[in-house]
């Protein structure tokens, strides 16, 4: 059973390792700069604790996935969704998205959004299955010479006062 917990200071190496392992199979399809940015090192993960929440998915106490978020005005940015290759297609990404969306809804954000690359068609399918739609294609010059997609989802049931 997948359990998702909030990441805490001290989880930086675990998160960095999960991200690297998840994206390593795509290293040759990324530009060097894009891969370096995507496969965030522990020191950069440490900085993210001040920027927004992070979660770790575990099976039997073993970390198998991670995701983080960045609160903005009306939108909540999803970044660094990463699932260990050996655990992919097991509902972990789905569970992480559910936890993240619940957090964003409870915080009264109106939308979730993310960027993904064309080299990750499985990620795009997961996001579309969860109600995300493509806002626009992002040109290569916008992100480390890699084209991609900006995707968004309206969060239902957000009550504004």
Predicted regions and their residues:
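C-terminal "cap" of GNAT-fold acetyltransferases
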Residues: 46, 110-161
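Conserved acetyl-CoA-binding loop-helix of GNAT-fold acetyltransferases
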Residues: 83, 89-102, 128-129
């Amino acid at each position: 059973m997948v359990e998702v917990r909030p990441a805490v200071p001290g989880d930086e190496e675990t998160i960095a390792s999960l991200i690297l392992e998840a994206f390593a199979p795509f290293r040759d399809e990324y530009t060097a700069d894009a891969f370096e940015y995507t496969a965030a090192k522990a020191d950069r993960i440490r900085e993210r604790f001040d920027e927004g929440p992070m979660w770790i998915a575990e099976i039997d106490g073993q970390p198998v996935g991670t995701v983080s978020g960045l609160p903005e005005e009306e939108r909540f940015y999803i970044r660094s969704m990463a699932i260990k290759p050996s655990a992919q297609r097991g509902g972990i990404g789905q569970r992480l998205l559910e936890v993240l969306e619940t957090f964003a809804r409870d915080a009264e954000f109106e939308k979730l959004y993310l960027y993904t690359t064309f080299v990750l068609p499985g990620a795009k399918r997961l996001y579309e299955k969860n109600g995300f739609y493509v806002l626009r294609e992002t040109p290569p010059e916008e992100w480390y010479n890699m084209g991609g997609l900006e995707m968004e989802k309206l969060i239902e049931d957000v009550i504004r006062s």
